[in-house]
Every structure is written in C-alpha cells, then in structure tokens.
Amino acid sequence: MSDEKYNAKLDQAGGKLKEGFGKISGDKSLETEGKVDKVTGKVKEVIVDAKDTVKGLAKGLDNKDK
C-alpha cells in the first residue's frame, strides 16, 4: 500500500473516531468534522486508485509499443 493510500485510510479512520466521539458527547460540530474527514479520506483514496490505474494503463501501452 502506498503512503498516499495509507494516509487516506488514516484520515477515514480518524474521521470515524471523531464522528463517534461527537455522537457520544452530543458535539454536533465534532460529529460533522468527523464526517468531513471520512469523506475527504475516501476522496483521497479514490484519487490514488485512479492515479494507479492511469499509471498501469500507461505502462501497458508503453510495453505494447516495444
């Protein structure tokens, strides 16, 4: 797993924790912040996956030309 993907997963996990603590404590602001962190982490993960796919396609096309 790349560092970028690992960090995206950490963002998602941290967001889940914040959201949970926000729910338990009744802190809507913390809960919302956690939800935002989760979504941000997921978006980062999707971007990393897309970059990996493009790199793989480019590499495949490179090998096809040889």
From Swiss-Prot:
Pfam families documented for this protein: CsbD (PF05532)
Task: State the InterPro entries in the record.
Answer: CsbD, YjbJ_sf
**Gene3D superfamilies associated with the record:** YjbJ
Q: Family per UniProt?
A: Belongs to the UPF0337 (CsbD) family.
Q: What is this protein called?
A: UPF0337 protein spyM18_1212
